[in-house]
């Protein structure tokens, strides 16, 4: 069994267990004529507040675990693809579109980056002409079905979906400084607070989701957090990024099942797409944390090794000028390690460990569109998706004054099983029932 098969088998084993347990332009918002946001909100919320409310939960999903609905109308960027139609993008999509091939979806979800460096970075990104992307069912649990076991568990303890369990979805191509994420999510949290008897809201994030929650917590006032936030449960947060994302700029990655492409055309379309996504760089290991502790890319011709500290050199040697520019801005984008960026709310973090985890690959060269030989993977301890360096990076939060910081290591529990793990869920429930810290 190669590494790709092993990872996918683990994904599916986790997902099957989850299914059984569960029972079944510019990107920045601009009111000027002709501009639009990349994702538009669709959805509404249920009515009257509960009596004797429970601590409400807002879930921040993992990378590509939020449903995106893509509408294509008279596109010309990919003449070999349908000119019009719709498809959805989300991990484990159970009804994938057959009109738009994976290559077509990659090309249509590739962002256009304005070369004008005088513009603020978030305003330089737009969709391909003729392509619009919406967050499907924003705020609702059906927008992130992977977490159904979490919803079912909370329901068994008195919670009601879409009333005191809500989902702060986002376009996983983008970083939290874009597309009105902050304003949209603040509004969702405040609405949840008021509709549940003015009860502070608990944030639960998984994988990349905690990065978006952390961005929110460090871009709101302490007074706002004191009023609206009960606490924060990050589950396997991808804090300083992960090493395995660096090969993706050359090999691509199919997010419908998190497997690497098996043909050169798909590898090229996917790798090129990820080079244009700001979140790719936010998800790539930050040299400030990783330094030279792991090899992320090793080439055969010429024989050369790259660590996270060499990331700019990697892109320079590959001739990827856009990647060089975006990496300089977005690698290490969400700050967390210094006291100025501590969340200053109660934190109950979870991680997995004890599983050999790929952190890099050996590639033939630095050409874009390579089909991966998984026997070349470099591994270290982790949760199958993220290495120990990533998962342990928030240990610095134990120095956060007054607020609680608890960090639980779930040995042998993989990244994708953590949100449905019985012990994790029981701790979450116990923490939801605890009073929040009152700090000066």
Residue locations for each model-derived region?
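Bacterial N-terminal signal peptides that target proteins for export
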Residues: 2-12
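Short secondary-structure boundary micro-motifs
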Residues: 2-4, 41, 216, 333
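Bacterial N-terminal signal peptides
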Residues: 10-22
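Generic "edge-of-domain/loop-turn" microfeature
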Residues: 17, 25-27, 65, 357
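Sterically constrained small-residue positions within well-ordered secondary structures
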Residues: 19, 48, 194, 340-341
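N-terminal non-catalytic accessory region
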Residues: 27-204, 208-268, 276, 283, ...
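Alpha/beta-hydrolase-fold enzymes
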Residues: 256-325
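C-terminal subdomain of alpha/beta-hydrolase-fold enzymes, centered on the catalytic histidine
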Residues: 303-440
């Amino acid at each position: 069994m190669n590494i790709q098969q092993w990872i996918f088998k683990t994904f599916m084993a986790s997902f099957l267990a989850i299914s059984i347990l569960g029972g079944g332009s510019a990107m920045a918002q601009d009111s000027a004529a002709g501009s639009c946001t990349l994702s538009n909100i669709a959805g509404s919320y249920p009515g009257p507040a509960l009596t004797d409310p429970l601590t409400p939960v807002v879930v921040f999903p993992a990378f590509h675990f939020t449903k995106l609905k893509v509408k294509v109308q008279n596109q010309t960027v990919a003449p070999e693809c349908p000119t019009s139609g719709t498809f959805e993008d989300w991990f484990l999509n159970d009804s994938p579109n057959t009109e738009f091939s994976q290559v077509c979806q990659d090309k249509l979800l590739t962002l256009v980056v304005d070369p004008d460096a005088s513009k603020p970075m978030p305003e330089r990104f737009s969709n391909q002409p003729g392509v619009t992307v919406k967050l499907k069912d924003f705020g609702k649990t059906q927008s992130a079905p992977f977490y159904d076991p979490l919803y079912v568990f909370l329901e068994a303890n008195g919670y009601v979906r879409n009333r005191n369990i809500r989902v702060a979805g986002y376009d996983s191509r983008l970083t939290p400084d874009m597309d009105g994420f902050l304003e949209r999510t603040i509004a969702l949290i405040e609405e949840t607070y008021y509709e549940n008897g003015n009860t502070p809201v608990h944030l639960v994030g998984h994988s990349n989701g905690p990065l978006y929650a952390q961005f929110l917590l460090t871009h709101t006032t302490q007074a706002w957090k004191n009023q609206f936030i009960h606490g924060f449960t990050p589950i396997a947060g991808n804090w300083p990024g992960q090493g395995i994302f660096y090969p993706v700029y050359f090999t691509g990655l199919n997010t419908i099942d998190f497997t690497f492409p098996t043909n050169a055309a798909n590898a090229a379309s996917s790798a090129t797409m990820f080079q244009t996504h700001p979140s790719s760089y936010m998800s790539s290991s930050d040299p400030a944390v990783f330094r030279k502790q792991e090899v992320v890319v090793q080439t055969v011709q010429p024989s050369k090794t790259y660590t996270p500290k060499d990331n700019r050199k990697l892109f320079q040697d590959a001739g990827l000028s856009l990647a060089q520019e975006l990496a300089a801005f977005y690698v290490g984008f969400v700050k967390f390690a210094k006291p100025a960026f501590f969340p200053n709310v109660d934190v109950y973090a979870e991680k997995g460990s004890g599983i050999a985890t790929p952190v890099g690959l050996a590639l033939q060269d630095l050409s874009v569109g390579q089909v991966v030989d998984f026997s070349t993977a470099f591994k270290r301890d982790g949760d199958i998706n993220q290495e120990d360096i990533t998962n342990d990076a928030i240990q610095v939060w134990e120095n956060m004054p007054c607020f609680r910081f608890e960090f639980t290591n779930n040995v042998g529990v993989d990244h994708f099983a953590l949100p449905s793990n019985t012990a994790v869920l029981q701790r979450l429930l116990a923490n939801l029932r605890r009073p929040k810290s009152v700090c000066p």
